Amino acid sequence: MVKKSRARNTRQGTNRYFIIGFSTIIIILALLMTAACVSKTNDQTKEPIWSIDGSNILSFRHRDLEAPQTILIEDTANYSLEKISYDSYGTTVYGLLRIPKNVSKPPVVVVLPAATVSKEEDSPMADALSSWGYASLTLDERGNGGETKGISPMDFTTGFEGYRRGDMPAQYAQIYDILVGYDYLQSRKDLDGGNISVLGESMGGRFAVIAAGMEPGFKAAFVVSSSPYGLDAGNNTDAIRFVDSVEPATYLKKIPPRKLVMFHFTNDTIIPIAYGRSLYDNASQPKAWYQYNGSVHGVYSDIYAPDLHAELMSVFGR
């Protein structure tokens, strides 16, 4: 379905200066192939927490919610806002938990912002979710300019080197952070732990697909302005396994019978709509595709809000 833009989102250019476009893939591939020459120095005395199966799908042997802390930073007539943190594989993850008032045990949406967008900058999405009666946990991703420190999951060269050593690549650590965030929400008695979905914008959309594929407790995956990475690992076996394990398309088959819902704008210059559609076309039912005229990329917009709200109501049942 195509919908005309009713208004231009004033934040649509927030992350324009970041792009993992197909024009940069040749550079990334060159770095991956260079890294493939690094000797394998896996420390056999320390078993990795992660493993890759025969389909190159990532899994973790266990997940540990460590040192969770909560600070109330805002309390209004309509919602409360808490800053939460927890330790997660070498760093401390920070997030903002917004809980609507006058809603008993609300469903929750885990929000994963686009590249260069912090949890605070993504507040329009949290505002909308709260107005619809949903809580939201918006995470600062690793190395994305927010409070959560660490190597960026966009650094594929360092990630591949870590993979070959048997360390935790940043790409895996980012997914681990999200899944531990899910576990944190499960521990909250004031939230509906049986009604949690994940929503990602641009870069965060890729993480959302992977996280939903790995954690069956997520009720659905919502993806705004995202696509496959489209990396080609050549003929190197290790590179193929690593690239497949971080590629969202690998995890599409793990999402059904839960729903994948995607939103994209026709004139998106950061991730062209054809790239987003390729991810959608590779997914199985149930799924839904919404496209709109305009160039909004990777942020909340009133343009797609009614469709997002309707899909959330369908998933959560309220």
Explain the meaning of each model-derived region:
Residues 120-175, 233-234, 239:
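Cap/lid segment of the alpha/beta-hydrolase catalytic domain
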Residues 176-241:
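Primarily recognizes the serine-hydrolase "nucleophile elbow" in alpha/beta-hydrolase
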